[in-house]
Amino acid sequence: MHAEETLARWRADEAAVRSRRGEIGVARPDQVAGLSGMEMFQAMFDGRLPSPPIGHTLDFLPVHIEPGFAVFQGKPGLAHYNPLGTVHGGWFATMLDSAVGCAVHSILPAGKGYTTLELKINIVRALTDRVALVRAEGRVIHPGNQVATAEGKLFGPDG
């Protein structure tokens, strides 16, 4: 698939998610009580639970989540630049942390939560706002009882 076709598909995916999602906010404990990670994400995608504010702040959102796998999509802007004129590494890290964290959360039963224990990224190419869209994929490698391991990657429509 060519980059232009991929970009068109990504934009359609994002439009579909944006058309269904709820208000920006944080779900109350009574709203998520009894929901597994996947049930919680489905409720977010259906607009029954609020969309977390971090995505609004940094201009990214989840576009697909299934057990053990999550895809986020975003558009870096000038507000995300560092002093060198490229996208700040924290933007990369936050989007990747969201993808791998949600991949882990998607396999958790009701009543269980997660937090990031360690995050390491390797940035192999600078990113600017000239990139139309970027995706972050997170995948669970090992779903341990106490500590899960996940990996992620960030890429554009050209791969």
What residue spans do the PLM features occupy?
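Terminal targeting signals and extreme-terminal segments of soluble enzymes
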Residues: M1-G159
